[in-house]
C-alpha cells in the first residue's frame, strides 16, 4: 500500500489540529492544547487502490521555527492553513509559511487552506474584528492568494461542522498524486 505524506503548517491556533482530529475521528476536540508535533494516519481508497495518508501536525508558534522543518523530508503535499477570522494568519501564509515550505521543499505541491469558516458570519467575531478595523477573509481573497503564490488551489473548511473538510484532503491527495507539470516531482529533502 502506497503512503502519501501530508504536512499541515500555519500559525498557532488557526485550527490545524482540529482539522486533523475532526477528519480522522469525526469528532471535534473540546480543548485547545498547542501542538509540538503529532501525526495521524488514515487509509483512503483512490479508485481501487488503498493509500495510507500520513498526516503530520506541526507547531505554528515561533519557538518551534528551528524544529518544525525536521518534519518536512519526504513530504508529498503541504496544507498551508490560516483562519478566515484571523487576518494576521492570512498575511503569514505569504510572509512566513510559503517561504519556509518552498525553502525546505521546492517543488512540493501546496494547498492554501482557510479554516474556521463556521465563524466567518459570527456577529461577535465580526464586531471584534471591526473594532480593529479588520474583517473576515473571503473565499475570493483566499483564491487570489493561492493564485499569487502559485499554490495548487485554495480550499476552505470548518472542522466543527465538517463543511468542506473531506474536500480539503481529497484535493491534497490529488495534488500529491498528480503534481503540476511545472513543478519538480521530487519529494522534500533537507540537506
UniProtKB/Swiss-Prot annotation:
GTP binds at residues 10-17, 57-61, 115-118. SUPFAM superfamilies: P-loop containing nucleoside triphosphate hydrolases. It is an enzyme of class 3 (hydrolase). A lipid is attached at residue 188 (S-geranylgeranyl cysteine). Residues 189-191 form a propeptide. GO terms for cellular component: cell periphery; cellular bud neck; cellular bud tip; fungal-type vacuole membrane; incipient cellular bud site; mating projection tip; nuclear envelope; nuclear membrane. Keywords: Cell cycle, Cell division, Cell membrane, GTP-binding, Hydrolase, Lipoprotein, Membrane, Methylation, Nucleotide-binding, Pheromone response, Prenylation. GO terms for molecular function: GTP binding; GTPase activity; protein kinase binding. It is a lipid-anchor. CDD domains: Cdc42 (cd01874). Involved in development of cell polarity during the cell division cycle, and essential for bud emergence. Affects signaling in the pheromone-response pathway through the STE20 protein kinase. Negatively regulated by the GTPase-activating proteins RGA1, BEM3, and BEM4. Interacts with BEM4; the interaction is direct. Interacts with AXL2. Interacts with RGA1. Belongs to the small GTPase superfamily. Rho family. CDC42 subfamily. This is Cell division control protein 42. It comes from Saccharomyces cerevisiae (strain ATCC 204508 / S288c) (Baker's yeast). The lineage of its organism: Eukaryota, Fungi, Dikarya, Ascomycota, Saccharomycotina.
Amino acid at each position: 500500500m502506497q503512503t502519501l505524506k501530508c504536512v499541515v503548517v500555519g500559525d498557532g491556533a488557526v485550527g490545524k489540529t482540529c482539522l486533523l482530529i475532526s477528519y480522522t475521528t469525526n469528532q471535534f476536540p473540546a480543548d485547545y492544547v498547542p501542538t509540538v508535533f503529532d501525526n495521524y494516519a488514515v487509509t483512503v481508497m483512490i479508485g481501487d487502490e488503498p493509500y495510507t495518508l500520513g498526516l503530520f501536525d506541526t507547531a505554528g508558534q515561533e519557538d518551534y521555527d528551528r524544529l518544525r522543518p525536521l518534519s518536512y523530508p519526504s513530504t508529498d503535499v503541504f496544507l498551508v492553513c490560516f483562519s478566515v477570522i484571523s487576518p494576521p494568519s492570512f498575511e503569514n501564509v505569504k510572509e512566513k509559511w510559503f517561504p519556509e515550505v518552498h525553502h525546505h521543499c521546492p517543488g512540493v505541491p501546496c494547498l492554501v487552506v482557510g479554516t474556521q469558516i463556521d465563524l466567518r458570519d459570527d456577529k461577535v467575531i465580526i464586531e471584534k474584528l471591526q473594532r480593529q478595523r479588520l474583517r473576515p477573509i473571503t473565499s475570493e481573497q483566499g483564491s487570489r492568494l493561492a493564485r499569487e503564490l502559485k499554490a495548487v488551489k485554495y480550499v476552505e473548511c470548518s472542522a466543527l461542522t465538517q463543511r468542506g473538510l473531506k474536500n480539503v484532503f481529497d484535493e491534497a491527495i490529488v495534488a500529491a498524486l498528480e503534481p503540476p507539470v511545472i513543478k519538480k516531482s521530487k519529494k522534500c529533502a533537507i540537506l
